[in-house]
Amino acid sequence: MDSYDLFRRLGAGAKFDVKRFSADATRFQVGKRKFDSESLEVLKGLDFFGNKKSVSDECGALQIHQEPPNEEKTQGVLLERSKEPKKKKRKKMTSEVPAQEDFDGGIQWTSSVEAKLQDEKVSGEKKLTSGKLEHLRKEKVNFFRNKHKIHVQGTDLPDPIATFQQLDQEYKINSRLLQNILDAGFQVPTPIQMQAIPVMLHGRELLASAPTGSGKTLAFSIPILMQLKQPTNKGFRALVISPTRELASQIHRELIKISEGTGFRIHMIHKAAIAAKKFGPKSSKKFDILVTTPNRLIYLLKQDPPGIDLTNVEWLVVDESDKLFEDGKTGFREQLASIFLACTSPKVRRAMFSATFAYDVEQWCKLNLDNVVSVSIGARNSAVETVEQELLFVGSETGKLLAMRELVKKGFKPPVLVFVQSIERAKELFHELIYEGINVDVIHAERTQQQRDNTVHSFRAGKIWVLICTALLARGIDFKGVNLVINYDFPTSSVEYIHRIGRTGRAGNRGKAVTFFTEDDKPLLRSVANVIQQAGCPVPEYIKGFQKLLSKQKKKMIKKPLERESICTTPKYFLEQAKQKKVAGQNSKKKETLKEKS
């Protein structure tokens, strides 16, 4: 036994790298073996067809005598071999691989077990069943959702989209609509758009939650326009409800922008009396989509006959759904119920959108919506991570005004939004800041609609640096480039806090939020501090030790906020004098008008 044979036996099933260990290969004569003349003679002497006879000589040595080839005998042997049952291809490959390698004297030896496994792997790749393909597809979809923090609940879930071009490939989107989306600067869909658009295009009812500034308006606008396909004269076929007129105006503007050139008639109710004539029973019904607030729509529905027809509505979208479902004076639950009942079409589908999940909204949707799909982005009821959040202790109510003036002295980068608890406090803070030499204005429900529109327009144009507002304006309004949000009065809940600070840090931009708090705000601190901590911002250690409020206490605080001291620094004596002068002036004007009439 030479070194080559010994190496082969010891290294059976192993692989040897000749290039890397060339010196050892030369030493042990590892390589393709060159057969000598004796080996070749032995090979020639092999009897494959039984034509040779072995005869022993006197010494007992084996001698081989070759007979002349017999054609008939050879053909018979071949016929017998052809009649033998053929082995399966896989088994044949398994048995032939090691034999061939042994014969060639190659370097790579593979055991029959390894060859069998390799063969099975190859055949498995060729014969992927439909079940395996479906499993692989689901794995890819789940990986994509996890990557973008998309959480989905429901049955038979549609796959998300990765690009807007997929809408053309899979859903045949109107080419003009797709071009409008791209021209508006929306190159890649946001996570909520990736999942919400396919869900609505499949005609599924939806409950969606995503952080502020994540593109929820576009997430329901695109599927509405795609499913309506083209304008018709059947009346309104899509209805979008929002809690404030400012938000409704913003949605209306976005819908008009992306539907340009498609022919859709998109309307908004400005004055109910004019709308009754425009959309009433005698109208031409040349309209497709309506964007409105609940109260204006209820006014039209309560008329006899109704001032608007909603029987052909196919999509009912409720934006800021958790606010609209609230009970009490600030909520719209009763109005929303009337609107739902007015949409009697069997084709109607409903979609709820908000930045925060409310438990009662979720339960209502599960009970009343048909096969609803729940979509949420990131952690539920969490603040957007692009906002730097800070809690600032100011001691008392007077400390808030001092802290505000200190911020003005240090300098700030406008525009700035300042949130207060009530309309009265908004007026008081406005009168205090107007003398600080900054462009400041106030917006609240007691101002006329024209005044509110002018204020919002001036703030967007940069003419106003600081805008004081109440919590209702925190819902959905998209002010471009807001750099700072100041919570002058502490929010009554973590949900309200999330919506307030969501006015900055929108569409991936950075922002900052500063929240003032006093000793009186101690019961509310823990819930807001948890939101700040989840977003990765620092929170003082002593706040983490505060007790949590019970659910009953939280509801009570929301319905009846803390009574706070007046912001106004003017002495009461001068305020009373000013009121008396104002009343006297009004009385004198009345007397003059009476004299003129007489």
UniProtKB/Swiss-Prot annotation:
Any one GO cellular component localisation term in the record: nucleolus
Residues given in the record as ATP binding sites: 210-217
Modified residues (N6-acetyllysine): 15
Coiled-coil stretches noted in the UniProt entry, renumbered to this chain: none
Pfam families named among the record's database cross-references: DEAD (PF00270), Helicase_C (PF00271)
EC category: hydrolase
Alphabetized UniProt keyword annotations: Acetylation, ATP-binding, Helicase, Hydrolase, Nucleotide-binding, Nucleus, Phosphoprotein, RNA-binding
In-chain residues carrying the UniProt-annotated modification Phosphoserine: 39
Location of the motif Q motif: 166-194
Reaction catalyzed: ATP + H2O = ADP + phosphate + H(+)
Residue ranges annotated for the Helicase ATP-binding domain, each copy included: 197-375
EC number: 3.6.4.13
Any GO BP: maturation of SSU-rRNA
Domain Helicase C-terminal: 386-547
Family annotation (PROSITE patterns): HELICASE_ATP_BIND_1, HELICASE_CTER, Q_MOTIF
DEAD box, short sequence motif: residues: 319-322
Alphabetized GO MF terms: ATP binding; ATP hydrolysis activity; RNA binding; RNA helicase activity
Compartments in which it is found: Nucleus, Nucleolus
Signal peptide limits: none
Function field: Required for efficient ribosome biogenesis. May control cell cycle progression by regulating translation of mRNAs that contain a terminal oligo pyrimidine (TOP) motif in their 5' UTRs, such as GTPBP4.
Similarity comment: family membership: Belongs to the DEAD box helicase family. DDX52/ROK1 subfamily.
PANTHER family noted in UniProt: ATP-DEPENDENT RNA HELICASE RHLE-RELATED, RNA HELICASE
The protein, known as: Probable ATP-dependent RNA helicase DDX52
Gene: Ddx52
